[in-house]
Amino acid sequence: MDWRAAEDLACDFLKKKGYRILERNYRTKYGEIDIIARCGKETVFVEVKSGRGKVDPLERIDMKKVRNIEKAAKLYMLQKGLKGPVRVDFVRVTPKGIDHFEGLWLG
């Protein structure tokens, strides 16, 4: 499965959980945020990882990636003039299904 299909599945999954998708593939100088959504009053920045092999796709997320997501999230909030709580979620898409890890990193 390619990254685009994984992100499409992740978006559909989040929408079914009541999330409102604001942006996809939002690019900044710090990198790209796969999905930006609203869940209640929170702005949620979602990193999507997919894979088929024996290595867990989440293992490809290191601290540098997390720091860059946090910087990109802060920049997004500033550029859009948004305030309020934020969080970073991770969605893992594999042939076995979709797993959603909420609030693994708070900005």
Swiss-Prot record:
Protein origin, superkingdom: Bacteria
Molecular-function annotations in GO: nucleic acid binding
InterPro entries on file: Restrct_endonuc-II-like, tRNA_endonuc-like_dom_sf, UPF0102_YraN-like
HAMAP family with a match to the protein in the record: UPF0102
Family: Belongs to the UPF0102 family.
Name by which UniProt lists this protein: UPF0102 protein CTN_0433
Native source organism of the sequence: Thermotoga neapolitana (strain ATCC 49049 / DSM 4359 / NBRC 107923 / NS-E)
